[in-house]
Amino acid sequence: MFAVIKTGGKQYRVAANDLIKVEKVAGEAGDIVEFAEVLMVGSTIGAPTVAGALVTAEVVEQGRGRKVIAFKKRRRQNSKRTRGHRQELTTIRISEILTDGAKPSKKAAEKKAPKADAAEGEAAKPKKAAPKKAAAKAESAE
């Protein structure tokens, strides 16, 4: 079974275990992402999306595409400009194509709240006193 999903302003025809490069999607390697904007599943066409359809995918890697050179030259004016751009891309592997509101077998990664707790724990620790070696060197120099 295949589906057509929309992400990053583009449409992609995907099937299970497909490996595709899409515009940057939030998440790190190994995270599970969900695409709820499914335009078509098999022979079912959405208007504009298919109700209850969901595509889950695993982030394989975050990377950047090839450099695109934008070169502008104004003839007979001794004027030119070169600019380069590399688009950020995410490589994903399609895990499942779900219909009729079915639940995914793997949960999508939730927001990382433990990091905030760790930051609070570090702030609660008292600062250590300055090392005594610096004071000893200052006394010996006098």
UniProtKB/Swiss-Prot annotation:
Single GO BP term: translation
Read off the InterPro entries from this record: bL21-like, bL21-like_sf, Ribosomal_bL21
GO MF, one term, reads:
rRNA binding
Q: Does the keyword Ribonucleoprotein apply?
A: yes
Keyword Nucleotide-binding annotated: no
Which residue ranges have biased composition labelled Basic and acidic residues? Answer: 107-125
One family from Pfam that matches here is: Ribosomal_L21p
Any single GO CC term annotated in Swiss-Prot or TrEMBL for this entry: cytoplasm
The job of this chain, per UniProt, is described as: This protein binds to 23S rRNA in the presence of protein L20.
Oligomeric form and interacting partners: Part of the 50S ribosomal subunit. Contacts protein L20.
| Protein name (Swiss-Prot/TrEMBL) | Large ribosomal subunit protein bL21
What gene name does this entry carry?
Answer: rplU
